[in-house]
Structures are given as C-alpha cells and as structure tokens.
Amino acid sequence: MRHPLVMGNWKLNGSTHMVNELIAGLRKELSTVDGCGVAIAPPAIYLNQAKHELAGSRIALGAQNVDVNLSGAFTGETSAEMLKDIGAQYIIIGHSERRTYHQESDELIAKKFGVLKEIGLIPVLCIGESEAENEAGQTEAVCAKQLDAVLNTLGVKAFEGAVIAYEPIWAIGTGKSATPAQAQAVHKFIRDHIAKQDAAVAAQVIIQYGGSVNDKNAAELFTQPDIDGALVGGASLKADAFAVIVKAAAKAKKA
C-alpha cells in the first residue's frame, strides 16, 4: 500500500527567523501525526539551518531544484551530491515555475531525474498542463509527453521509489483548484500510463496533487484513490494550515 506524502514547497520565501519559527510550529502541530510522510523544501540558502531545526523530527528535508552537473564551473547552481551531503532527500524537479521562467525542457528535467536517482535522492517530478492546454482538451497528452521524457530515456524502473506531482498550471497560486473528480481522473491516467510498461511500478509510485491545495479542500481531494498526498505551496508557509493538510492525508489513507 502506498504511503501518502505531503511536501511543502516554500518557493522564494524565508528568513532565518521564519525558518526557526515555522519549523518549531510544524514540529508542535505534527508531533502526533502518523501514517503520512512529511517533507519541506526551503530555499537552498536555508537548507542547513532547516536541517538542524528538523533534527529528531519525522519531517524530511527537501529542495526546490538541482543542477544536472555534479561539480565544475556552473555559477549559482547546486548539485545532487551537495544536496545529499546536507541531508536533503526529496528534490523537486520540473516545477512549472522552472519550466516557464527558466525555459527548462522535458529533456533537461529527465536528465535531472537521472542524476538524482544515480546519487540516491528522491525525485519529485512535477507535470501538468496550462490553462490553454486544459481548455483544448490536451491535459492527458501533455502529461504523457512529460512522463515519456523520463520513461523513454531512463526506463520505467526509474519511477521505483520516485514521486510525481500533478500540478495543473492554471490552478497554481490562483485560488482555483481542480475538483477531486477532475484531479482523480488525471492521477489515474498518470498511473495507467506508467502501468502500460510496468503495473507494479505504477502501483507503488506516489502521485501528489499540486494545484492550490489548502486546509479547506485537502480532505476531499485525499479521498480519491490515486491521490497520494500533496505538493503544497502557499499553505506550507503557515504551520497550522499545513498541519491540517497533513492530518487530512493521514486520516483519508487510514480509512
């Protein structure tokens, strides 16, 4: 049985004070929660501080991006080996903001996926369609293309122990969210697409929902059979709201 994972993507938010305060709040709110994996991805500059603040807790450390290179003349980048060295486990790749603002291609993201697997880190592969693609009925085609970039270069076994986050771009930071039924349909398509090559791999892969998940809509989303937690943006910056989402995932998947 799949173990749900709720991960907080802090994006470009944080300060030394906020890291201390938010993690203290999370530790308090989540101290008794069982049955749901939890991870946070602060900005890279705060990873070491977050690692120390998380010590002894069950909250895993994540990161928001990685470079394809392990070392060398790549100013401003962070390698998979560095992330592993500092204690990060879950690494977000392919987020729509990276695809849009940094023109990251499916091919580059597949390379990042491969590097993370090679180093022993867990890729959190973000896929999803824009509003125009959604309205044109291209959701499944877009998701398939983004998955195939990994499947065709690394093979289906690469998804063993990996995480996929379906993030409809039109729902990120907009307050809009897919209905539970809409989200479930896409999550099922993603799992079925992988199952065409290996049903066992498809059955174990965690597929998070990442489109404006908050403390109000989480419980209903998590009742869906193929939604295995969430990649949370804005709500992950508030300990109480994030805790509601984690608790909803733990409760729904225990039922």
Swiss-Prot record:
Q: Where does substrate bind?
A: N9, W10, K11, G173, S212, G233, G234
Q: Its GO CC terms? A: cytosol
Give the pathway: Carbohydrate biosynthesis; gluconeogenesis; Carbohydrate degradation; glycolysis; D-glyceraldehyde 3-phosphate from glycerone phosphate: step 1/1
Q: Does the keyword Cytoplasm apply?
A: yes
Q: Which reaction does it catalyse?
A: D-glyceraldehyde 3-phosphate = dihydroxyacetone phosphate
Q: Name one GO molecular function term.
A: triose-phosphate isomerase activity
What EC number(s) does its UniProt record assign?
5.3.1.1
- Residues of the active site: H95 (electrophile), E167 (proton acceptor)
What enzyme class is recorded for this protein? isomerase
Query: Could you mention a single GO BP entry for this protein?
Result: gluconeogenesis
**Family the entry assigns:** Belongs to the triosephosphate isomerase family.
Q: What does this protein do?
A: Involved in the gluconeogenesis. Catalyzes stereospecifically the conversion of dihydroxyacetone phosphate (DHAP) to D-glyceraldehyde-3-phosphate (G3P).
* Record note on quaternary structure: Homodimer.
Protein name, as recorded? Triosephosphate isomerase
Q: Which organism is it from?
A: Yersinia pestis
Its gene name is tpiA
